[in-house]
Amino acid sequence: MQTSFVALLAVAASLASALPHGGNSYEASLPEPTNLPEPTKLPEPVEGPYKPKPPILPEPIKDNYKPKTPILPEHVEGPYKPKLPEPTTGDPKNNTLPVPTCVDGKIKTHKVKSGESLTTIAEKYDTGICNIAKLNNLADPNFVDLNQDLQIPTDACEKDNTSCIKPDGTATCVKDGKKDGKDIYSVVSGDTLTSIAQALQITLQSLKDANPGVVPEHLNVGQKLNVPVC
């Protein structure tokens, strides 16, 4: 019996030596304490009922307040004229606009037909009577021959209808009693009473008076007309 008790004491001693810290197994298994954060302080309670702050209102308008009158542009009488930009300074050559150029048309050949005159031919080719007369060296633009070939400067930039035309006559009769040795005029192709009167340097009315019954719009080639002489 004594031997069993001694054996138990020996086992207990061996177990105690195997444990840390003198055999206190409970203390060895606990973790070390950690630092906890301090609790936040709550705001102190407000004594009495809650009173919100009053809103900030704009200042009241004074009794003598007068709003500013807007400044309007002065009324301009008459039509509206927009302001144009002033011309730039510097070299005047840089301020000039390009001048459009005009180029005359080609020269075409035209054979004179019955009833045509330089006036009708010039209108057909958009040119001037004197442009045609000068190119063809015509002494009198009022006279062209039937089937005559004319060089026509078409689409003339500067149409000349006056420099080669004789002024209207002011006399009522042909002096010396004759015109080229005759007092009878024979109508040629392209003639009109006006062109004949200009060639004779007499008024159109005096030529009409000398040829009663003649229709100016229907002259025939070879028709004889009386020339008033004095």
UniProtKB/Swiss-Prot annotation:
UniProt PTM: N-glycosylated and may be O-glycosylated.
Region (5 X 4 AA repeats of L-P-E-P): 30-87
Region (Disordered): 20-102
KW Secreted (keyword) present: yes
Entry annotated with the keyword Signal: yes
Subcellular location: Secreted, Cell wall
SUPFAM superfamilies membership: LysM domain
Biased composition (Basic and acidic residues): 74-84
Subunit-structure text: Forms a multimeric structure.
Protein name: Intracellular hyphae protein 1
Organism: Colletotrichum lindemuthianum
Lineage of the organism: Eukaryota, Fungi, Dikarya, Ascomycota, Pezizomycotina
Gene name, Swiss-Prot/TrEMBL: CIH1
